[in-house]
Every structure is written in C-alpha cells, then in structure tokens.
Swiss-Prot record:
Belongs to the heat shock protein 70 family. Induction: By stress conditions e.g. heat shock. Residues 602-613 have a biased composition (Low complexity). It comes from the Bacteria. Residues 602-638 are annotated as: Disordered. Acts as a chaperone. One of its GO terms (molecular function) is unfolded protein binding. NCBIfam families: PRK00290.1, PRK05183.1, prok_dnaK. InterPro entries: ATPase_NBD, Chaperone_DnaK, Heat_shock_70_CS, HSP70_C_sf, HSP70_peptide-bd_sf, Hsp_70_fam. This is Chaperone protein DnaK. Keywords: ATP-binding, Chaperone, Nucleotide-binding, Phosphoprotein, Stress response. The keyword ATP-binding applies. Residues 622-631 have a biased composition (Acidic residues).
Length: 638
C-alpha cells in the first residue's frame, strides 16, 4: 500500500504533508516553497500554469487567472455569495449547465472542482517527487462550516486529480490534531481559523489521544481576500479623488492593486506604516498616472474593523453550543495566515480572556493534521481517535414548508437517524423528499441539498401510510438519505448530490481531461528538454569547429556543417522525434572533431611538460606555509 498524503486545499495557498515514521513532514514543491498558491492560469497558447508560475503572470493575464476558487466550490450561480464574488474578481464567473457557479476562459467553462483538481494534481506531483513513488490516496481538509454540497465538490476535485479521497477532515480539527499530537496534556481548546477565504472556530476536548469536537461554527465567505479587497476599495477611492479616474473598470490595474494590497496587508503585520507605489497604473490624455500613498496600520484596522468583529459572533455561538464559557477554555490555537494581524490577536485575546497559543505554523498546521489523520487511517499513527461533528442541522421539508430537523448541528459523526412521516392528502401514491441543511425554521430559507421521489405508495387516507426517512452521515460529513414505505417495504436511497453538483459522467470527463492535460504537459516539457539539448550541442560544436576545424578533413567538416544545419532546421519545429534524430546525427558527425581535439591535446602534452619544467627552473625559491605536526597527532588523524 502506497503512502496516504494529507492536503490542505486552501483558498489562497495549499500545502501537502506526509507521515515519515511517527512525525509529519511538510513537503516542498518544485519551486522549493512549502506552500503553493491556489492559483491556476491558462496562457495564450493554451498552456496551464499552477501555483507560483500562475501567480507571477496574473497582472498581465487577469481574465484567465483563477484564484480564490474555493469560494465558488459547491455553490450555485444564483447564490448571493456567487453574485457578490462576481464583482470582486477579474475573471468571468458563468452559469454551469447544472446551474452551479463555473468559471470561463477563452469560451471554455470549468467547474470549481476542476480548477481545484489542478491544484491538487500539483500537490500530488509534489508528494510523488519527494517519495519517489506514485500517490493515489489522500486526506483533504475543508472548512468546518462547509455544507454537504461543498464537501462533495471537494471530494470530486480529488477524484478528478486522480486521488482516492479516504477522508474529508475539517480544518480546525486537523489543526487540533497537529497541535495535540505530541502533547500529553488534556483539556478544552478553541481553534480560531481565519484563512484566505473562510473562517471557522471549533471547540474540542482533548485527552488520552481522543480528539472530540464539541461544536463548530463559522463563515465560508470571510477571510484574507476580504481584507485585501478593503484595501483595494480604499486605493481606488483615493485615486479617483485625486485623479478623477475610476480604476475599477480596468482589470489590469485592479490586478496590480490586488497584489499591492496583499503585500501591504502582510507588511502591516510587522510595520506600523507601509508605502504603496504603483507607477503607470493608468493614463489619460494628459499622460501616464502613478499611484503613491502611505497606509498606516491604524487606517488599515479601521478599514477592516467590521470584518474582524464578524469573527466574534461565531465564537460566541460555538461556546454556547459546546456548553462552555470562555473562561473554561484552556488554550486558544490560532490558525490561518490572517492571524498574524496584531488586531486579530488582540480581539481573540480580549474575547477569550487569555493570550492565544502561537506555537504552531499557521500556514502548515492544517496539512500536518491531515497527514496525521492519513497516518491514523494507514495504521502508522496509533492511539489517536478523532470524533468530529456535522456543522449544520439536517432535515426535510414537511407540510407548510416547515424545516423538520432529523439531525441537529454539532452531532458527532458518523451518525444515523430515522423518523416516520405520512402523506398530506388522501390516496397520495408518491411523496417528494426534499433534503435541506441549515438552521432556519422554514425549509426555503435553508440550503436545498437535493430531492427525490418515493413512488408506488398504496392508496390510503391521509396520515395512514408510514414513510420512514433515514439520514446517514459518514465520517466525511457527506449525507445519504433513504425513504421507505413500511407497508410495501419499497425503498429509495440516494447519496445527496447538490441540486447542481457534478454527475459521474461529468467527473469521468474531467478525469480524462486532466489525464490528457498531464500528457500534454509531459510532452511540452519533453520538447523543451530536447530543444535545450540540441541548442547546447550546436553551441559546443560551433565552438569546437572554430578551434579545431582545420585539424579534420574537409569531407568530415562538411558532414558536421550539414548535420548542424539539419538540427537547426529541426529546432524551428516542434517534432520531438525529429529533433532527437538530428541531435544524434550531429553527435555522430562531431566524433571526428573529438578525435582531432584529443590528438591536438596529446601533441601539446610534451611541450606543455617542457614549459612547466622550464618555469620550475626559473623559480628557485618557493614560498610555502608549513605546520609542524606532532607524531602523536599524526597517528590520531590517520
């Protein structure tokens, strides 16, 4: 059995780790970094870039560079959060065939699961390169407050990337696993996780290797991206005030502003003031315009104060659901890049009444926890038991549009619960089961996860038939629902697939597409390598011909020139086999040059020796440093 890896699929950055013996290890990517930007881009010639290469070209290619895609995963196009996101990103968000939010580049639509799969593929390749063996299984993390559709879409992304997702694990729970792995202490901890796009808070009890989640809460549309956007809004408003030009319509300018905002935000975690300089940000008929202004930490904090305060209400709810007070929390663990902001640390300290624990790397701790869970599943990590919860209540729509809960939020998973319902009308021969997730009293105000029909109910007065509805939530937090007519034992079961969601056919198509892309990437890399090899050979041969061309017969020299010309012609095209063949031809033709070089060096050998001897005679005195070595020391060293 191959290694199971742990992946933190983040909104802004992703990270991969693996258990090496009893210790988790974060794996560096091909660029030597321990985290990889969750960014995917397509170039003019159709090449796909992932991670840092994609981020580097974002300013010049904003419409084909997809970032913060995790905010769209598992969401419908009509979701208010999708509509909000449309105004914040330079790329096109389009309606998928299934009604979900997809993205579009050059007329081709991609599902968020597909874009996320490209990042997961990069993580998979990073692990394979480090381990020296294929990787086919993974544990992937998601925000604790993700609903069923978002969890299912994340699992689909893993499948598209060629990974069997053994477990979907909540990010704060993963962080707690990493935090508590080597610590023998027990107690109640709060994990405050503010990442690039989502916020979660979980309350856990730890003791004797058992990690029990008591409650979780959060906001799947609150994170570092929102803090960046506040700076961008401030910069565009200030520029408009000064220059009278609206930069919000200029996608290139907006992308530059976004990069500058992220940089300023990071700098203000350690500095009290930063300067933002963007020369040639735009131009009008009077000439080019430059943006230059100072941003203080105090001003930044005032711009984002409401975002910081938005994290407190979920903390309050999580404590209430767990049945504990802030004073009963033994340790507060901070996770996610945004927790480096001093204001965040201050607010957390004020709310919980204690100094938060900063002993974990906020960018890597979630991936480390995922690797620990992978180790548990693989049997490498013993005596660790993880008991997670479902973040939202689950139920069905009943008469009058009421939301009837079958499983309450913060119920430990896996879990199974049944309830018996009946018909609303006389002689009703079918019922539609509509499954919802949320906390509102009316079904329509919650998230519709899916629906199905149970048909063939024998005619009977209303209220007589007995229909048993069973909810089954697995350890990934993914829901299965069964409806059964007790009179006939007729049963209908579905794995809840969001009203949109990807069908198996969609996933298969995307898997094939990903495999084809991987093959294309491999061919592109091979082409670059053989071209480099050919060009290096031409350079070396030309140099040798200049130096030793007069030492070889004219016929051999002519053959070398012909082979060189043929290789140069082949290098202008993209035929790998042709370039390889012409490279081999030139190598064989150049062998005569090698013989000439060797003969010339042999002939120069005696002369060179004579010169060296003459030189030695001229220099009668040789200066040298010397050191006396004790005989005993010499023996010791020997």
């Amino acid at each position: 059995m191959g290694k199971v890896i742990g992946i933190d699929l983040g909104t802004t950055n992703s990270c991969v780790a693996v258990m090496e013996g009893t210790q988790p290890k974060v794996i560096e990517n091909s660029e030597g970094a321990r985290t990889t930007p969750s960014i995917v881009a397509f170039t003019d010639d159709g090449e796909r870039l992932v991670g840092q290469p994609a981020k580097r070209q974002a300013v010049t290619n904003p419409e084909r560079t997809f970032f913060a895609i995790k905010r769209l995963i598992g969401r419908t196009y009509d979701d208010p959060m999708t509509q909000k996101d449309k105004g914040l990103v330079p790329y096109k968000i389009a309606r998928g065939d299934n009604g979900d939010a997809w993205v579009e580049a050059d007329g081709k639509k991609y599902s968020p699961s597909q874009i996320s799969a490209f990042t997961l593929q990069k993580m998979k390749e990073t692990a394979e390169s480090h381990l020296g063996q294929p990787v086919t299984q993974a544990v992937i993390t998601v925000p604790a407050y993700f609903n069923d559709a978002q969890r299912q879409a994340t699992k689909d992304a893993g499948k598209i990337a060629g990974l069997e997702v053994l477990r979907i694990i909540n990010e704060p729970t993963a962080a707690a696993l990493a935090y508590g792995l080597d610590k023998k202490k027990s107690g109640t901890i709060a994990v405050y996780d503010l990442g690039g796009g989502t916020f979660d808070v979980s309350i856990l009890e730890i003791g004797d290797g058992v990690f029990e989640v008591k409650s979780t809460n959060g906001d799947t549309f609150l994170g570092g991206e929102d803090f960046d956007n506040r700076i961008v809004e401030y910069l565009t408003a200030e520029f408009k005030k000064e220059q009278g030009i609206d930069l919000t319509k200029d996608k290139l300018a907006l992308q530059r502003l976004k990069e500058a905002a992220e940089k300023a935000k990071i700098e203000l975690s350690s500095a009290t003031q930063t300067e933002i300089n963007l020369p040639y940000i735009t131009a009008d008929n009077t000439g080019p315009k430059h943006l230059a202004l100072k941003l203080s930490r105090a001003k930044f904090e005032s711009l984002v104060d409401d975002l910081v305060q938005r994290t407190i209400e979920p903390c309050r709810k999580a404590l209430k659901d767990a049945g504990v007070s802030a004073s009963e929390i033994d340790e507060v663990v901070l996770v996610g890049g945004m927790i480096r902001m001093p204001k965040i640390q201050e607010v957390v300290k004020s709310f919980f009444g204690k100094e938060p624990h900063k002993g974990v790397n906020p960018d890597e701790v979630v991936a480390i926890g995922a690797a620990v869970q992978a180790g548990v599943l693989q049997g490498d990590v013993k005596d660790v038991l993880l008991l997670d919860v479902t973040p939202l209540s689950l139920g069905i729509e009943t008469l009058g549009g009421v939301f009837t809960r079958l499983i309450d939020r913060n119920t430990t998973i896996p879990t199974k619960k049944s309830q018996t319902f009946s018909t609303a009308e006389d002689n009703q021969n079918a019922v539609t089961i509509r499954v919802f997730q949320g906390e509102r009293e009316m079904a329509a105000d919650n998230k519709l996860l899916g629906q199905f029909d149970l048909v063939g109910i024998p005619p009977a007065p209303r209220g007589m038939p007995q229909i048993e509805v069973t909810f089954d939530i697995d350890a990934n937090g993914i829901v299965n629902v069964t409806a059964k007519d007790k009179a006939t034992n007729k049963e209908h079961q579905i794995r809840i697939q969001a009203s949109g969601g990807l069908s198996d056919a969609d996933i298969d198509r995307m898997v094939k597409d990903a495999e084809a892309n991987a093959e294309a990437d491999k061919k592109r890399r091979e082409l670059v390598e053989v071209k480099n090899q050919g060009e290096s050979l031409i350079h070396a041969t030309e140099k040798s011909v200049t130096e030793y061309g007069d030492k070889v017969p004219a016929a051999d020299k002519g053959a070398i020139e012909t082979a060189m010309t043929a290789l140069k012609t082949a290098l202008e095209g993209d035929d790998v086999e042709a370039i390889k063949a012409r490279t081999t031809d030139l190598m064989q033709a150049s062998m005569k040059l090698g013989e000439a070089m060797y003969a010339a060096n042999q002939a120069a050998g005696p002369d060179a020796g004579a010169e060296a001897a003459a030189s030695e005679k001229k220099d009668d005195v040789i200066d040298a440093d010397f050191q006396e070595v004790d005989e005993k020391d010499q023996k010791k060293r020997a």
